[in-house]
């Protein structure tokens, strides 16, 4: 049975919503796959045997977020602080065991407990000069994740999945500086870094202490004849991973050319992504269990043409 749980929000604002806080609570249920609850053994593939588990329970995810925000309209200054906590009860996981003598793998769905994460983030943005052309922004986030899952076991012929507990500490920081030239042109620079520390209790767990960082610049300006040009150049780098394929440097260049006609109603836009062709179509990342996952993107470099038409429809007067 799947019950519906309400979404709760408590808010308090002062001075025309320029200062205040919000408390958000959400409970999200998740049903297990009914096929996994059928207590039978599926040996259609004799080397990969699926076992049923009639005692599976519903997964419940509880999210609590507290948000403080403040805005000074005259100085165009804004700042916010967010605190978050998530707990997953009876999380659904797929475990397996491997018999080294026969080569048979047995797997089934189970419930695990102990998955939770806590986070805090702070953002701040404000102009630095009286003309409000030069603005500074920063965003900071720290997060701790306790991930519990099931991993394979190669001892014996019976199903014996093992519990895997992995702790991850994340620290992100982003700094940006933007400058307005006139009323329609802007330029800016940005630098961002994310430190990741992953540790597990298993004897064969490979500790991870790595940094992902990027830095670059953006420019957008208007040309005569209703032409607009925008471009950004960013270097994406990763350091500290054990595998050399994870420690990479990728220079990404994107650009957009747009043309407006019919008094601003019709806009043609041509976007170019990864113009230099430096991105690899294979992406590697580390998940919450400290394992490397590989994804393949078939179209890393492309150009696309957009057409947008803007119109207003006024209701008829009766």
Descriptions of predicted regions:
Residues 1-318:
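Exposed, low-structure sequence patches enriched in small/polar residues
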């Amino acid at each position: 049975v799947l019950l519906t749980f309400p979404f709760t929000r408590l808010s308090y604002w002062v001075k025309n919503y320029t200062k205040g806080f919000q408390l958000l609570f959400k409970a999200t249920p998740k049903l297990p796959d009914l096929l996994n609850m059928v207590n039978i053994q599926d040996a259609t593939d004799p080397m990969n045997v699926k076992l049923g588990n009639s005692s599976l329970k519903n997964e419940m995810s509880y999210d609590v977020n507290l948000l403080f925000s403040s805005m000074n309209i005259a100085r165009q200054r804004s700042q916010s602080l967010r605190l978050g906590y998530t707990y997953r009860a009876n999380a659904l996981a797929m475990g397996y065991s491997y018999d080294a003598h026969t080569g048979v793998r047995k797997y089934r769905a189970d419930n695990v407990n102990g998955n939770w994460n806590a986070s805090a983030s702070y953002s701040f943005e404000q102009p630095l000069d009286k003309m409000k052309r030069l603005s500074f922004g920063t965003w900071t986030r720290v997060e701790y994740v306790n991930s519990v899952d099931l991993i394979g076991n190669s001892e014996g012929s019976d199903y014996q999945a093992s519990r895997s507990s992995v702790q991850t500490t994340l620290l992100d920081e982003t700094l940006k500086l933007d400058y307005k030239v006139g009323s329609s042109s802007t330029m800016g620079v940005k630098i961002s870094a994310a430190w990741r520390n992953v540790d597990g209790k298993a004897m064969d767990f490979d500790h991870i202490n790595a940094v992902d960082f990027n830095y670059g610049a953006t420019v957008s300006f208007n040309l005569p004849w209703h032409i607009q040009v925008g471009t950004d150049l960013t270097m994406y780098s990763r350091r500290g991973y054990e595998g050399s394929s994870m420690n990479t440097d990728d220079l990404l260049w994107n650009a957009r050319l747009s043309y407006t006609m019919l008094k601003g109603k019709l806009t043609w836009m041509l976007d170019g992504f990864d113009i230099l062709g430096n991105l690899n179509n294979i992406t590697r990342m580390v998940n919450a269990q400290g394992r490397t996952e590989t994804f393949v993107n078939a179209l890393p470099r492309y150009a696309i043409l957009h057409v947008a038409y803007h119109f207003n429809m006024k209701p008829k007067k009766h």
